Amino acid sequence: MGSSFETIDIATSARRIGVDNRISLKFYFRIADNILKQANIFRAEKNVIDLYVMLLRFSSLALETIPSHRDYRTSLKSNKEYLRMRLLDVLTELEKLKPVVQQRIDELYPKLKPRYNVQAHPANGSLGWSSAVKPSFNSYDHAKVRNPPGHNSGYMGSRGQQFLNAAPLEERFRKMSVNFRPNEETLSKHSILGPGGLSAQWQPPKYDTKVQYPSNIDFSPVVIPSFQQLVDSKPMITNGSNDEPEKPIVEPSVASNEKIQKNYTEELSSMISFEEPESVNENNLIRQPSPPPVLAEVQDLVPALCPEVREPECMIENSLPDESLRSESPLELHIATSMMDTFMRLAKSNTKKNLETCGILAGSLKNRKFYITALIIPKQESTSDSCQATNEEEIFEVQDKQSLFPLGWIHTHPTQSCFMSSIDVHTHYSYQIMLPEAVAIVMAPQDSSRNHGIFRLTTPGGMTVIRNCDRRGFHAHSSPEDGGPIYNTCKEVYMNPNLKFDVIDLR
């Protein structure tokens, strides 16, 4: 982890994630699955800080967000039990990781150690290290240097920050449906942050996890039980380019087998129940079009800068009054230089007929960088100004079978200019909820000024606008409260000439 930071606010990562009931419950289970997949990779790579952040995010999602969904009460009991058991494993691992994370931070920045302020803040239960300044580190728990404080993320747009008004984790346990009212000593014992914050003296765990990087391997993801079906019809898979980032073999999340943890786990298990969700707004699910396609000509391993647009760069905006709650940029995303041309060849027939074509982008995570290693062409229905996948479950099954992260979508504008329509931003909203790094690529072959664009919704501005919009079809959107744009051109995306990708045609 050769990185730097100005402020580490790990506790902020556990801030409550609000529920959008237009999005199906199974989608939230997939978000949980993706968080655990990232945690597995960070664990295998011995990246304890990002691992800690991912586990905190999962605990918040499992304790608060998922049980608050309006469909949770009627969901399968097996899914609830699976979630509860994974949560127990995660909470146990978090307790063990606290001293390891503190030690790692001290090792990385020994000269800055006197400047840390490692303590639990009584007002909000957060834990912060202040003013440890080093340049240009993009991490979930490391704020960008020299950025003004940023707005709070309305959803999952930032890895290091969720909602401002988050109660302490102890308070979250009190809100759960528990079998008994634990005393303060018990609450302190089971707090994720612990009675003494990260500086508390727990014995660090010993991991036997090994990591290898073969050139080409398929491995199964952590999957919610109800989504374990395989694809019935075999998709056509072709090789799209040359080199591929090696995929790590990762071990699943490990629950402690030590006897000292047995009583802790049993007591914590008795406290956890998901039967008291908070009241939520009963909005109907709004079905927006599924993932679409794009083109690009960029130099080797340089940021994929699109031609000038009025939107500023695709960065998470930072303007929070509280310095400890700054948000961070997404991780780097690498795209094969030839991928957009490959997609346009696949879309050629539709483009000639003035019909849009869409594709889904998926890939892998290695050394804190995402790589798009698969271009999935789903069964779809198209018009001159829209494109919608017709079998979303088939797409999910392909991603799960190959342990791929959902990294966005690509689609054509056969005769229109290069921009994100109102339908496009609604489509991309679900991708960016799933993963902040997800991008929307628009291919506009008839646009002489820019024939492609790589976009993300702004956070929190654009994400909040779309989250609060219940309209369908083409319509106007109001500007975000901060006066900024709804979406931006991305600048953390790199075109990689050595990256290999597969084309998976499901049509």
Curated annotation (Swiss-Prot):
Pfam families: JAB, USP8_dimer. It is a peripheral membrane protein. GO terms for molecular function: K63-linked deubiquitinase activity; metal ion binding; metal-dependent deubiquitinase activity. It is an enzyme of class 3 (hydrolase). The keyword Protease applies. A motif (JAMM motif) lies at residues 411-424. Zn(2+) 1 binds at H411, H413, D424. Zn(2+) 2 binds at H426, C469, H475, H477. The keyword Cytoplasm applies. PROSITE patterns: MPN. GO terms for cellular component: cytoplasm; membrane. Signal peptide: none annotated. The record marks E356 as: Indirect zinc-binding. Its EC number is 3.4.19.-. GO terms for biological process: protein K48-linked deubiquitination; protein K63-linked deubiquitination; proteolysis. Keywords: Cytoplasm, Hydrolase, Membrane, Metal-binding, Metalloprotease, Protease, Ubl conjugation pathway, Zinc. Its cofactor is Zn(2+). Belongs to the peptidase M67C family. The JAMM motif is essential for the protease activity. This is AMSH-like ubiquitin thioesterase 1.
